[in-house]
């Protein structure tokens, strides 16, 4: 019996790509080596029909590549050729107004393009039954695959570091400023207990660019973002209550925005943890 050939097109090389696309399909092949052959291709040749028709199943996250409309046409072509198309989605297509790219999504109608891809896909996989019910308004063939990890992966087996403090950790991305702001009152109320608590902010990152627009000429200029301008710097001010819960010396160290070590950081009430690759990021859980 011939193997079922599966093509996986991840949306990125970070968390979503790893945990929603790459790892599950590697597991599928490893558990069923006689039945499945899986190829993972980040940038497939979109216009090569022979490439696509060598597969029985094509799985992708939200879209096959960044061009949603081109992906939609490709999905319909694959359907017509008998290739099973499977669209995975883990986030609602229209984030709230507090989300940093809400306006970009709305202006470019990306939400509508995502829904259009859901409609033409043969099957849709998602994270929860609640979200599945929303998707079923557009496509009845929805299967729930909850987010999952491989607990035997080394990054999830890191032993928890010992501490006399109650450590409160946060791991997340750069789109959660509004969520962190909701915690501000809680952080403020715990200020009097700063000697018994340590906040651990994971994923700190100063990379990125900003686009400045000349009001007179309309000219767009892109430059590297300055560390104090990053959302992570704003997170840090909330966690530390504008640096009031840490020593003045540690504050000076943090405001250098470099990754040099600080000898006494474990005795401070706040710990900055710089971002790590997706294959080792979960080691941060050992810090709280």
Predicted regions and their residues:
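Membrane-proximal helix-turn-helix segments that form the acceptor-binding/catalytic region
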Residues: 76-80, 104-123, 137
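Structural alpha-helical scaffold elements that stabilize or flank donor/cofactor-binding regions
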Residues: 51, 116-117, 284
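Active-site proximal beta-strand in glycosyltransferases
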Residues: 78-95
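Conserved catalytic-core segment of nucleotide-activated headgroup transferases in glycan assembly
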Residues: 12-27, 150-156, 161-284
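Donor nucleotide-sugar binding/catalytic pocket of nucleotide-sugar-dependent glycosyltransferases
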Residues: 119-156
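N-terminal pre-catalytic "stem/leader" segment of glycosyltransferase-like enzymes
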Residues: 1-66, 212
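An aromatic- and histidine-rich active-site surface loop
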Residues: 62-80, 180-182
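Nucleotide-sugar donor phosphate/pyrophosphate-binding loop at the beta->alpha transition
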Residues: 44-46, 84, 95-116, 151
């Amino acid at each position: 019996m011939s193997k079922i050939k599966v093509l996986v097109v991840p949306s990125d090389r970070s968390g979503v790509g790893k945990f929603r696309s790459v790892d599950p399909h590697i597991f599928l092949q490893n558990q069923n080596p006689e039945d499945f052959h899986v190829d993972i291709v980040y940038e497939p040749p979109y216009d090569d029909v022979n490439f696509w028709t060598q597969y029985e199943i094509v799985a992708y996250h939200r879209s096959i590549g960044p061009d949603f409309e081109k992906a939609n046409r490709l999905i319909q072509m694959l359907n017509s050729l008998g290739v099973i198309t499977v669209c995975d989605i883990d986030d609602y297509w229209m984030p709230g107004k507090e989300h940093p790219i809400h306006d970009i999504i709305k202006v470019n109608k990306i939400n509508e393009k995502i829904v259009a891809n859901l409609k033409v896909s043969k099957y849709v996989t998602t994270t929860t039954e609640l979200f599945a019910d929303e998707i079923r308004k557009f496509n009845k063939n929805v299967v729930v695959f909850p987010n999952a990890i491989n607990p035997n992966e080394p990054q999830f087996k890191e032993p928890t570091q010992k501490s006399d403090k109650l450590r409160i950790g946060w791991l997340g991305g750069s789109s959660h400023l509004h969520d962190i702001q909701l915690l501000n009152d809680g952080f403020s109320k715990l200020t009097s207990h700063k000697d018994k608590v340590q906040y651990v902010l994971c994923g700190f990152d100063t990379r990125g660019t900003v686009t400045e627009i000349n009001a007179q000429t309309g000219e767009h200029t892109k430059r590297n973002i300055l560390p104090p301008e990053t959302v992570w710097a704003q997170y840090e001010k909330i966690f530390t209550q504008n640096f009031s819960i840490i020593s003045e010396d540690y504050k000076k160290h943090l405001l250098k925005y470099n990754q040099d070590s600080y000898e006494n950081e474990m005795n401070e009430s706040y710990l900055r943890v710089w971002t790590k690759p997706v294959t080792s990021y979960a080691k941060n859980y050992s810090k709280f």
